[in-house]
Amino acid sequence: MSIQNLNSLLSHNVKGQTENLLIVDTRPFSDYLKGHIPSSINLDLMQFHWLDTSITGIKQFNRQSRFLLSNLGIQNKEKVIFYDDTSGPTAARGLWLLLYFSYKEVAILDGGFSKWKEKGFKIEKVTNQFQYSRFQGKVNSDVLATSKEINLVIGSKKNSKAYIIDSRSEKEFDGTVVRGGRRGHIPKAHHIDWSMNLANGYFKNYNELARVYSDFPKDKQIIAYCQGGYRAANTFLALKLLGYKKVKVYLGSWGEWSSLQNLPPER
């Protein structure tokens, strides 16, 4: 959603739309207190990392995520808008999380709070309260990859079975910067820094994004990963904007992969 469209909805209190709109600020609470979009609630999604994609780990992730989303007060048929400072990773993570639970009435605010503020739109400092609901979204495994699935991909003799995209920085990818248990990247991964998705804080237009991902056929499975599944969620969204149908986020990402000694790294 554009900042202009959201501002119009809030400014004119469009009947039947603003009442069914939930705006979620995914920045740190300290930033939220300094000013935020009117009526938005705060959920610092960077605090909700999950690095265990074993069968038990995914079951726990599902349980904890439903609890988290219930605290947001998400109701059926309600439009949810996530935002951060730009069109960044935490807002994209919120969108991906709802899609994982088959909730389709979701978007991010393109440009984020920095562009909202830059345009001079209204800002408030009051802390808006959560309204609890019982969220019971149905899991959509088509958007989440596990370490087991990644291992099957890299073990396949057919390189075309799926494409793996590393959304981290180049220095993380080549092992110059070490975050996690080991340095390097997942074998067979292609490196495209998530920041290539943006220009001046907004998502690039279709043609510009298409050039970034021109090496990846739309009929193949794409799996994005980063350190903890946030930058990868931004890549997930970019690919969805381009019309890719089979896109997943490796939830555990490098944080999990590098900690499991039985899984091979590459440099």
Regions from the PLM with identified roles:
Residues 1-267:
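Cytosolic catalytic domains that perform sulfur/thiol-centered chemistry
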